[in-house]
Design a protein with these regions (language model features):
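Alpha-helical scaffold elements within enzyme catalytic domains, especially in hydrolases
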Residues: 74, 108, 137-138, 195, ...
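The cytosolic transmitter module of two-component sensor histidine kinases
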Residues: 61, 65, 98, 131-132, ...
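Extended hydrophobic secondary-structure segments that form protein cores and membrane-embedded regions
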Residues: 85-87, 117-120
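Short helix-capping segments at alpha-helix termini
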Residues: 108-113, 142
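Bacterial c-di-GMP phosphodiesterase EAL domain
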Residues: 1-110
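EAL-family c-di-GMP phosphodiesterase catalytic domain
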Residues: 1-29, 37-44, 119-126, 144-145, ...
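Distinct, well-ordered alpha-helical segments
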Residues: 94-107, 127-135, 155-168
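Aromatic/hydrophobic pocket-lining residues that form π-stacking "cages" and hydrophobic walls in ligand
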Residues: 72, 102, 135, 192-194
Length: 245
């Protein structure tokens, strides 16, 4: 179910789906999974996804995205109570027809879009405001949750966050990792959570991999955390064992 082979200029790429658990800081319970693509070439060499997406043709990127979304829908059909975060590639952002096709897949699989969170990146700030606002509004109209990743890597505006009304803000790994050794990082993180991110928005800290950093996040019992300290991404088989289905 979770392996796809793509032909690109007579060369083969194998793509598999993995699932990164997102934990509640209080209780350390899993409340969401993030689906990830893992790409290998014909020599079984692993290729970094972000670098691969920079050089792959749009058709190939869409094929990988389609495969991941299909995997998410199949998973949600098998297990009630799970929600999954799905990262939309930058190359497909603002493509209304593609967004409509994702919504159609939910209908074909009888899966509620409300169980899927579409994650967009910081490149959103480089897109004309009218286009990005219309795209995100349409995604919300379809019922999808919305998430912004890598937050905190540039000057942020509370007003823009309120305008786009993200359900979840993911604080960048580069900001979170090492806060115990960097008072400046820690101060920035506190400012973003306490003053910039709108109240009621879910906050997830990426890259929590040190106990010293985790201890400083303990004041925020409501936030979510990701990182190898808790779990590496899971294969579909490992996820089935963990969730018992």
């Amino acid at each position: 179910m979770n392996i796809k082979t793509l032909e690109i200029a007579d060369k083969k790429l194998s793509v598999t789906a993995e699932f990164k658990p997102v934990m509640h800081l209080s209780g350390k319970t899993i409340f969401r999974y993030e689906v990830l693509a893992k790409i290998y070439n014909a020599s079984d060499r692993w290729l970094p996804v972000e670098q691969s997406f920079d050089i792959l043709a749009r058709e190939t990127i869409q094929a990988i995205s389609d495969f991941l979304f299909e995997t998410v829908c199949e998973l949600l059909k098998m297990k009630e109570g799970i929600t999954v975060s799905f990262k939309l590639p930058a190359q497909l952002m603002n493509d209304m027809a593609y967004l409509a096709s994702l919504y159609q897949q939910c209908g074909d699989h009888h899966v509620a879009p409300q169980r899927i969170e579409i994650e967009v990146g910081e490149w959103l700030t480089d897109t004309p405001q009218m286009h990005r606002q219309a795209f995100l509004q349409q995604a919300r109209t379809y019922g999808f949750m919305l998430s912004l990743e890598d937050f905190g890597t540039r000057k942020e505006s509370a007003d823009s966050l309120r305008m786009f009304r993200f359900d979840t803000i993911k604080l960048a790994r580069t900001l979170v990792c090492g806060i115990a050794a960097s008072p400046a990082k820690l101060s920035t993180l506190h400012n973003l959570i306490d003053k910039v991110i709108p109240a009621g928005t879910h906050v997830i800290c990426e890259g929590v991999e040190r106990s010293s950093d985790l201890a400083l996040l303990s004041r925020y019992s409501h936030i979510g955390i990701e990182g190898y300290m808790f779990s590496r991404p899971l294969t579909f088989s490992q996820l089935r064992l963990l969730e018992d289905f």
